[in-house]
């Protein structure tokens, strides 16, 4: 049985088990444990405690998306940080990769993003970046978690109360949006423009509602901006990367050359070609990876993907002399493998794309700019470029569960998975894993017969519901 990170072909270390932190920070329903103001304050204190190193005046950047609860959590975590004698710099609504960029460029000691990414507005989350713009390693998150939960280092942590003259200050960052827009435009080749192109941009009423339209307009495109009026409750509501259908329809209505749908914090993107056909993260990795191979700029001719990526990605890259290295699910693990092994491009099927020569984390706008650069350089539409990727049929079922028992402790589930794997043989694969952000088990079956694999995925899901539901 291939279960989570133990799936064949994966590299790197298994994620460290933690109680608060998932694969993308701490996440939950706003104002319900652990996503409360009290917890945010303690997380801020613990982060400030961990990053204090040296005698300089320490600073931490805080950004957020457009959720109603962002105001509450922003003030709470800022209070926790400043109570430890560390200054706070507030960006307001800005994409997650924008906070990573500002953290590094402003020489801050850490960055904080308040967002639940593609989740509905009722949820929120808190994730941390180190001073170099990369997500904090699992081990550092564990250290923060232990401080918050009272498991280690308590005496010094609780005793550290700076005097009134040493309490941290908080201030707004001047033109955070403008700084990030300038950076994104610098990624696009200087000898190219977007003149003559019409682009549909779905911002999901999220953090990129100012940034994304500005970038493409300033590079010369005519922009059809969708879902750019956040009200605190409409983020990701029937729009954005999880619901790209309206973006695809707008392409046909406006006869656009390309469409892109971002999620709430704009760290992922789903594209659609000029005919309104969806182009997901795997297809983007295939076409961009092949282009980088042609340009001789793909490090070690390797793209880093996760165990969820389609087998069609491996075949598309193999046809151009490239290969795929797989990791556990989560863009943080893709980035860790890229840094560890010297790779420069990778991502996830869901649309997290990391161009490590330019950015430190998934960046939806940067990914779209890289695809547009290929289109302009080659003089070919996205529909033609995306033909290099032929997906193998996949069936994905998400099973809501009440408990997270090890799958190895569920003999009937193991028996059904083994039976399906035997039936698939070398023409497919099975992946069963717990979600890192939700109380769900994800069942993925890949094979040549779409109807058959759907039935097989449902069979496994039914057994999981009996055992854990």
Curated annotation (Swiss-Prot):
PROSITE patterns: PGM_PMM. Mg(2+) binds at residues 117, 263, 265, 267. The keyword ATP-binding does not apply. Catalyzes the conversion of glucosamine-6-phosphate to glucosamine-1-phosphate. Belongs to the phosphohexose mutase family. GO terms for molecular function: magnesium ion binding; phosphoglucosamine mutase activity; phosphomannomutase activity. Its cofactor is Mg(2+). The lineage of its organism: Bacteria, Pseudomonadati, Myxococcota, Myxococcia, Myxococcales. It is an enzyme of class 5 (isomerase). It comes from the Bacteria. The modification Phosphoserine is found at residue 117. One of its GO terms (biological process) is UDP-N-acetylglucosamine biosynthetic process. Keywords: Isomerase, Magnesium, Metal-binding, Phosphoprotein. SUPFAM superfamilies: Phosphoglucomutase, C-terminal domain, Phosphoglucomutase, first 3 domains. Its EC number is 5.4.2.10. The active site is at residue 117. CDD domains: GlmM. It comes from Anaeromyxobacter sp. (strain Fw109-5). This is Phosphoglucosamine mutase. It catalyses: alpha-D-glucosamine 1-phosphate = D-glucosamine 6-phosphate. InterPro entries: A-D-PHexomutase_a/b/a-I (IPR005844), A-D-PHexomutase_a/b/a-I/II/III (IPR016055), A-D-PHexomutase_a/b/a-II (IPR005845), A-D-PHexomutase_a/b/a-III (IPR005846), A-D-PHexomutase_C (IPR005843), A-D-PHexomutase_C_sf (IPR036900), A-D-PHexomutase_CS (IPR016066), Alpha-D-phosphohexomutase_SF (IPR005841). Binds 1 Mg(2+) ion per subunit.
């Amino acid at each position: 049985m291939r279960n989570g990170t133990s799936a064949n072909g994966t590299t790197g270390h298994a994620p460290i088990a933690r109680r608060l932190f998932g694969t993308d920070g701490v996440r939950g329903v706003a104002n319900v444990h652990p996503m409360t103001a009290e917890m945010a304050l303690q997380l801020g204190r613990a982060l400030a405690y961990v990053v204090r190193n040296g005698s300089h005046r320490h600073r931490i950047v805080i950004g957020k998306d457009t959720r109603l609860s962002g105001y509450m959590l922003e003030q709470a975590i800022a209070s926790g940080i400043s109570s430890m004698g560390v200054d706070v710099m507030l960006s307001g609504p800005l994409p997650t990769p924008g906070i990573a960029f500002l953290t590094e460029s402003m020489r801050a000691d850490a960055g904080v993003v308040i967002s639940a990414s593609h989740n509905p507005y009722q949820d929120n989350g808190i994730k941390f970046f180190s001073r170099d713009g990369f997500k904090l390693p699992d081990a550092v998150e564990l250290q923060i978690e232990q401080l918050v939960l009272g498991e280690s280092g308590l005496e010094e942590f609780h005793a550290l109360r700076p005097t009134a003259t040493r309490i941290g200050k908080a201030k707004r960052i001047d033109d955070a949006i403008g700084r990030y827009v300038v950076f994104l435009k610098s990624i696009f080749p200087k000898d190219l423009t977007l003149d003559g192109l019409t682009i549909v941009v779905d911002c999901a009423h999220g953090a990129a509602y100012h940034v994304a339209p500005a970038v493409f307009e300033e590079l010369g495109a005519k922009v059809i901006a969708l879902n750019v009026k956040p009200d605190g409750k409409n983020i990701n509501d029937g729009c954005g990367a999880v619901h790209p259908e309206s973006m695809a329809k707008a392409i046909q209505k406006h006869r656009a050359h390309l469409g892109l749908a971002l999620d709430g914090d704009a760290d992922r993107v789903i594209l659609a070609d000029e005919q309104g056909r969806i182009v997901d993260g795997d297809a983007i990795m295939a076409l961009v990876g092949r282009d980088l191979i042609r340009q001789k700029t793909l490090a070690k001719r390797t793209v880093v993907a996760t165990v969820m990526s389609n087998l069609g990605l491996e075949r598309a890259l193999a046809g151009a002399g490239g290969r795929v290295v797989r990791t556990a699910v989560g863009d943080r693990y893709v980035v860790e493998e890229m840094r560890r092994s010297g790779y420069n491009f990778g991502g996830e099927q869901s649309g997290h794309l990391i161009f490590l020569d330019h950015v430190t984390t998934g960046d939806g706008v940067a990914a779209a700019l890289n695809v547009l650069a290929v289109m302009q350089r080659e003089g070919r539409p996205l529909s033609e470029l995306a033909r290099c990727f032929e997906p193998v049929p996949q069936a994905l079922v998400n099973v809501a569960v009440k408990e997270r028992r090890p799958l190895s402790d569920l003999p009937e589930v193991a028996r059904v998975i083994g039976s399906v794997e035997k039936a698939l043989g070398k023409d497919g694969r099975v992946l069963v894993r717990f979600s890192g952000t939700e109380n769900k088990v994800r069942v993925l079956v890949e094979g040549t017969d779409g109807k058959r694999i759907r039935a097989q995925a449902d069979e496994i899901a039914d057994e999981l519901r009996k055992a854990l539901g």
